[in-house]
């Protein structure tokens, strides 16, 4: 595989293998349930698509889009505000929801989304993330399925971006940016 940018932290082959494993586990856990797969755009789009194909049971699919305002900078300490800008189109009342995220860093976005989805009265809500940065967690959130735990590095590729670029990389690469805003 040709390297387009950066130093890979997770290769395309490693991601494919892990997503197959997650798909098998989710298939087992959700068999016989009224199941809705909810992706968080834009970052989770690549992971979401590959994971959906790896899940071998009938499901509904839907998406949310969120916007973070006032992202916390390392220097300012200003807390960010999470806002849902595109709502679900599926009615999730009484259904089992699996929220698909690209990365869980502080936990703020996931916490906000789980609370928002809970107001729609689903039967259950679980969280699956491609990447987890446990060292950055400031909010204790339940993550039911984790693709990879990674160190506190800014990563791009496979849906994750820097200024809307690099989402198309087929692997995850470290981007070295001193003093940049939080990733989540």
Residue ranges and their predicted role:
Residues 1-184:
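PRPP-associated nucleotide enzymes
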